[in-house]
């Protein structure tokens, strides 16, 4: 009721105030050496370009760029805004100092100063204190992030399984709890989170209202009677924890609390009150939870709309999740790329803005005194056609653009959501860790979401740095088919992949790094004198090419010494599977399984251009496929999986349609000093063949056959 009354009062004062502002006008003389910024036509009284802007924000911005160029001025209700769609000017924008173009003035204009403190001029101090205390203690924070992501998964399984819901609130809770555990060393309870959630939702509404409602009115209504009360409730709940740091001067579980309690104003000698410290915490939790949760949600929606990448991320992360291996998870190349791609494609239309103070120019353009903000149109520089100077097909979802050999830029000056320069977000890397953990746990524990794309609602004018995508999704737990198998004092991560006629088994960590080095070097040495080591130099890079083979299935020929080391390895893998057949669903009663004796070996090298078309093996059935080197995008029937270096795929390949659709460029560092003949991935197939079977073709016929791939 109070909110409705407040809105009524706001509307009552709105017309008089905005009419007054509309009637105020000035003439500004442009200096001879500067260009005049073109003003977008079509502004209407009081509302400015608001109506046209709100119909289709992105198309409106594209139309403005097409008509007026890379710099133009528009009016959104009571805000005069200069918009930059120019990469060179974005560099100047990021280099500007606070006293020239102010971020804090913009934030105060959006009501953040009044939102976070009873002292409106304290926002700059609050943000500086947050920056000073955001130190990422990786080994301390990473396990907490993983623990909270696991908790999120458990809640979704136990409380929301089979229900349709908006995922944003659950992700916000995950981020809030994670940030609280890491930065203030506290588990926030439901009472605190309820206040934070109400504070966040109301502040988001107020931020939007600031574009057409004066601050004094918002402060006298929504802030005084509602927003401030939520903030005070949160700071009250923090008092007991703050007092622990006042009592114990050596307590340092939270760097933020420690720094705040120890802070002494250099001019007045005053210390911070509990309320001051609480305000800093509220600011931190609001900023971190809002932006990070939207990015995580956008990533999951983008993965849903691009199912191949959902499957690939699941494949890349499954073993790391099973082992609790956060170090490799946070470094996983494809996971990192999908986070940056969703950030690039899902920015707020004007996430970065500054208030001109001591400057009256940007580049060669004159900035008039009536300009309230200078804003970067981030989508223009990241995903509009304008961005094709940096990004290939910029409006398309293509995470591998950031990976070698393309290496399209993902630094702060290009993927701009966290800002750059003096005002770059200090918690950027921490936020990315949170997003990666949430994505990895959700993708590996739930089926890919299903929804009608037409039901997706997108707000590019949200109160956050990211656009807000809203859709209700159903969390359906996926079948847990990944197993931790202990064999010979070592834990192996094995995934049971069910196919149409049979199954396959993927052992993610069959070979550790040292073994990968040993086995590849062994393969190279036993075939050193073969003609294939010379022929591969002339072979086309788009074709996989053999370097070592023994008792080749097709010809019965060998070009190397008997690879005993490989056959012993295959026997161990077979024993691992048969000893754990019940858990893994391995068909030990199949005669082909019981009689499997590894005696045929085929090792080939792939370049980044190599592919293997979809096929079923015609002359062999069960076997092992070992991967060493760059990751491989492997299609197995209707599933796309990632074969990492050191993995082994086992199955009856005569009953499984399979192909190699992509080779990633990044060969692991631990293999960088080995001879790969300018290729990046080694694949070995080990089979069991009948020694009495006659050869199917000559060696030359075999070489002619593989040249057709």
UniProtKB/Swiss-Prot annotation:
Give the superkingdom in one word: Viruses
Annotated binding of heme, by residue: 425
CC annotations in GO: membrane
| EC category | oxidoreductase
Q: What is its main location?
A: membrane
Q: Which family is this sequence assigned to? A: Belongs to the cytochrome P450 family.
What function does this protein fulfil? Catalyzes the 14-alpha demethylation of obtusifoliol to 4 alpha-methyl-5 alpha-ergosta-8,14,24(28)-trien-3 beta-ol.
Q: Which UniProt keywords apply?
A: Heme, Iron, Lipid biosynthesis, Lipid metabolism, Membrane, Metal-binding, Methyltransferase, Monooxygenase, Oxidoreductase, Steroid biosynthesis, Steroid metabolism, Sterol biosynthesis, Sterol metabolism, Transferase
Q: Which residues cross the membrane?
A: none
Coiled-coil-forming residues are none
According to UniProt, the name of this protein is Probable lanosterol 14-alpha demethylase
Would you kindly state one Gene Ontology biological process term found in this protein's UniProt entry?
methylation
**Compartment(s) where it occurs, according to its Swiss-Prot or TrEMBL record:** Membrane
Its Enzyme Commission number(s) read 1.14.14.154
Q: In which pathway does it act?
A: Steroid biosynthesis; zymosterol biosynthesis; zymosterol from lanosterol: step 1/6
Q: Which cofactor does it need?
A: heme
GO MF terms held by the record: heme binding; iron ion binding; methyltransferase activity; sterol 14-demethylase activity
As its record notes, the protein acts as a catalyst of: a 14alpha-methyl steroid + 3 reduced [NADPH--hemoprotein reductase] + 3 O2 = a Delta(14) steroid + formate + 3 oxidized [NADPH--hemoprotein reductase] + 4 H2O + 4 H(+)
């Amino acid at each position: 009721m109070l909110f409705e009354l407040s809105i009524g009062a706001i509307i009552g004062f709105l017309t008089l105030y905005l009419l007054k502002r509309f009637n105020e006008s000035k003439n500004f003389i442009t200096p001879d050496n500067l260009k005049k910024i073109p003003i977008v036509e079509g502004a209407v009284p009081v509302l400015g370009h608001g109506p046209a802007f709100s119909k289709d924000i992105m198309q409106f911005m594209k139309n403005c760029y097409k008509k007026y160029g890379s710099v133009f001025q528009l009016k959104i209700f009571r805000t005069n805004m200069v918009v930059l769609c120019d990469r060179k000017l974005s560099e100047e924008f990021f280099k500007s100092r606070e006293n020239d173009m102010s971020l804090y003035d913009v934030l105060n204009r959006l009501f953040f100063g009044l939102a976070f403190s009873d002292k409106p001029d304290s926002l700059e101090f609050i943000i500086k204190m947050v920056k000073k205390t955001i130190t990422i203690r990786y080994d301390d924070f990473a396990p907490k992030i993983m623990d909270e992501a696991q908790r999120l998964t458990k809640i979704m399984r136990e409380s929301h399984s089979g229900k349709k819901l908006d995922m944003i609130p659950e992700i916000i809770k995950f981020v809030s709890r994670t940030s609280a555990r890491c930065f203030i060393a506290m588990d926030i309870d439901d009472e605190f989170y309820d206040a934070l959630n109400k504070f966040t939702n109301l502040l988001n509404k107020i931020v939007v209202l600031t574009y057409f409602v004066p601050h004094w009115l918002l402060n006298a209504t929504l802030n005084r009677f509602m927003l401030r009360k939520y903030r005070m409730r949160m700071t009250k709940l923090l008092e007991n924890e703050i007092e622990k740091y006042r009592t114990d001067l050596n307590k340092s579980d939270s760097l933020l609390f420690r720094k705040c309690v120890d802070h002494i104003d250099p001019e007045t000698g005053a210390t911070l009150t509990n309320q001051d410290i609480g305000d800093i915490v509220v600011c931190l939790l609001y900023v971190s939870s809002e932006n990070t949760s939207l990015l995580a949600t956008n990533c999951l929606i983008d993965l849903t709309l691009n199912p191949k990448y959902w499957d690939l991320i699941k494949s890349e992360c499954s073993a790391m999740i099973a082992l609790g291996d956060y170090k490799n998870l946070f470094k996983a190349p494809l996971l990192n790329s999908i986070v940056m791609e969703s950030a690039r494609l899902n920015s707020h239309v004007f996430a970065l803005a500054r208030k001109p103070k001591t400057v009256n120019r940007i580049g060669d353009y004159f900035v008039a005194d009536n300009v309230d903000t200078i804003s970067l149109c981030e989508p223009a520089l990241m995903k509009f056609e304008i961005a094709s100077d940096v990004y290939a097909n910029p409006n398309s979802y293509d995470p591998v653009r950031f990976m070698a050999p393309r290496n399209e830029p993902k630094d702060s000056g290009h993927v701009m959501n966290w800002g750059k320069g003096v005002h770059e977000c200090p918690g950027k890397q921490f936020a990315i860790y949170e997003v990666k953990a949430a994505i990895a746990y959700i993708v590996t524990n739930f089926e890919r979401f299903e929804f009608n794309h037409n039901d997706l609602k997108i707000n590019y004018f949200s109160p956050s740095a990211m656009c807000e995508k809203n859709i209700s999704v159903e969390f359906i737990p996926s079948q847990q088919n990944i197993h931790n198998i202990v064999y010979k004092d070592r834990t192996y991560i094995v995934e049971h992949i069910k196919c149409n006629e049979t199954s396959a088994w993927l052992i993610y960590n069959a070979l550790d790094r040292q073994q990968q080095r040993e086995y590849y070097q062994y393969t190279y040495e036993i075939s050193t004198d073969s003609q294939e080591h010379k022929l591969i130099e002339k072979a086309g890079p788009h074709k996989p090419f053999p370097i070592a083979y023994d008792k080749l299935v097709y010809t019965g020929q060998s070009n190397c010494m008997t690879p005993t080391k490989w056959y012993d390895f295959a026997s161990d893998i077979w024993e691992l599977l048969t000893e754990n057949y019940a858990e893994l669903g391995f068909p030990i009663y199949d005669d082909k399984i019981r009689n499997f004796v590894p005696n045929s070996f085929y090792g080939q090298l792939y370049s980044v251009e190599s592919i293997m078309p979809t096929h079923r093996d015609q002359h062999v059935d069960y076997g092992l496929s070992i991967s060493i080197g760059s990751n491989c995008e492997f299609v197995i029937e209707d599933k796309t999986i990632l074969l990492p270096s050191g993995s082994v795929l086992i199955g009856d390949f005569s009953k499984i349609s399979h192909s190699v659709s992509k080779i990633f460029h990044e060969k692991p560092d631990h293999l960088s000093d080995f001879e790969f003949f300018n290729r990046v991935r080694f694949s070995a197939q080990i089979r069991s063949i009948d020694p009495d079977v006659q050869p199917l073709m000559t060696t030359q016929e075999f070489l002619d056959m593989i040249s057709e791939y």
